[in-house]
């Protein structure tokens, strides 16, 4: 599914029709000047994800599963927390990013909760989790490079909401941080400027 319960990252939800219809939809969007941005969720996956099932232990991923963390490294995790330090994970997700640009000609990605692409264990401390994380920067830049390897104009938008010093690194690299500013803009557009900041 494309939602917040991902399981197969090379497959879209059947509600989008078959492969040819989905490609036609994207082509029709492009004819009308509409960019197609896929919302990607790489920080977690459901238990039916093949990489979770490969190493399964009762109701959870097994302790020896290199793809997943048995216990989430950050406070906002749902389902199974993905280990992005594992080389197999990185290769897999880079190929996913290349695939959708190459095969379907999507224009880019909005990457959900990229702050969760970390192995730095902050437990339930959201403040620590938001701090500058050099290893996370390497991972996110690596994914951006993969997305842009097929088409350098590919949009790479991150929902990060972390420390400004970290987000500045991304912006200087050409990554587009989304800082949840749309609510204020919506307020102004609707004429409610007095309640926006």
Which residue ranges define each predicted feature?
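Conserved alpha/beta catalytic core and glycan-binding cleft of carbohydrate-active enzymes
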Residues: 105, 133, 138-197
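Hydrophobic faces of well-ordered beta-strands that scaffold small-molecule active sites
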Residues: 36-38, 109, 156-158
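Substrate-binding/active-site clefts of carbohydrate-active enzymes
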Residues: 1-105, 113-132, 143-149, 193
